[in-house]
């Protein structure tokens, strides 16, 4: 499968001829610019390329995850779990995938607050939403892992061990990262279109956009993805980011 650092957007969204596609190459310096370009294209579609008329102008907002509530859960046996929640001086990443040494699985959880001046109004109409995470490392370095992103609601926003289980914390929807995450993605941002999940979160009236990031269902890959989640001054440039365009 192809590397996960390519994001494809239907050309029809940008007003081009049917059947063609735009490919945006995602790398460590261009991914957030690429997402902004996509959002701008969708904004033009939403308003017909004109500011004239009664249609509200789309708004683009960028929301960093909450490092106090982000975390991961490791399943250590069929009925036991280790929960890590909150970034600290010694913990500045979250994990997703299967440890190739211990064969225990990790699932990462990210929390994006939707309230406040920089959030998304409860009555907003969602145009698009993209999630970006910086791949800090991959274990082993030559491994590859298919990644699934699920919309969940762990409220109050405190993780418990059974949140690992899809049966105990059922997803409201899910999307897949395009292509496996591989060594080529280390040090780069991986982006995934979560528009359908954001629309569902709005429909449910969720006050936070919360996701569970895990290895996709199927045969195990025995590869662990390390997602950067720093609390250092460069957090705005490296932390998980949700970009939402709405009207």
Language-model regions, residue ranges each:
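Bacterial N-terminal signal peptides that target proteins for export
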Residues: 5-35
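C-terminal motif of bacterial Sec signal peptides marking the signal peptidase cleavage site
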Residues: 43-46
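N-terminal leader/pro-regions and domain N-caps
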Residues: 48-92
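Proprotein-processing/basic-patch segments
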Residues: 50-64, 76, 199-247
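A short beta-strand-loop element at or near the start of a globular domain
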Residues: 78-137
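Residues within well-ordered beta-strands of beta-sheet-rich folds
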Residues: 109-113, 120, 125-134, 191-197, ...
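Extracytoplasmic/secreted cell-surface and envelope-processing proteins
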Residues: 121, 139-144, 219-227
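Beta-strand-rich interaction/scaffold domains
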Residues: 138-207
